[in-house]
Amino acid sequence: MCNSIILENKIFDSQWDNKNHTLFENLMPRDNNNLIENSNYDNNNINNNNNNNNTDNDNDNNNDNEPFYNSNIPNEMQINKYSRFGFKPSQPISKKNENQIEFNNILSFSIKSFLLLILYILFFNYQLYSKYFIILLSLNLIITLISIKSIFKYKNLKKLKNILIYKIQSKIIIL
């Protein structure tokens, strides 16, 4: 059994030596002098990185360890040196998305506060706290409407957050 495995390995090794490792050379050239003619690699991009103007990042130091940028490959396919797996970093959140996130946060806050008010009334006597319930419910609706309007009114979201915090604090004081 062991002899057959050794024999198979020797046969495999001899076949591998005869093929001259062409599989790996087709996938990735080992050095600059051994490039395949039909590949997308360009000798100028590898040997003359400092003189290349068709790069994604012009501020590169062009060290040997960093990936080179090939002008034949489209920008979407280029390897980004700052990412670990070759993907470009995620784009920053736009203002519309930021406003949408803030809008969703405000809506979730208003729904939660409304549910808390209902729980508050359920645990206590409804007749004693009916006036307070109506006042708190109206305050909740007013705060929600004002905060939704202020999203479209204020471009700076920090101002909006400060306004919301102030209104929440006033609501807690009333409670």
From Swiss-Prot:
Statement: the UniProt record of this protein carries the keyword Heme: no
Bias-annotated ranges (Low complexity): 35-56
Coiled coil: none
Topological relation to the membrane, as annotated: Multi-pass membrane protein
Keyword Transmembrane helix: yes
UniProt entry keywords in alphabetical sequence: Membrane, Transmembrane, Transmembrane helix
Name listed for the protein in its UniProt record: Uncharacterized transmembrane protein DDB_G0291522
Residue spans crossing the bilayer: 106-126, 132-152
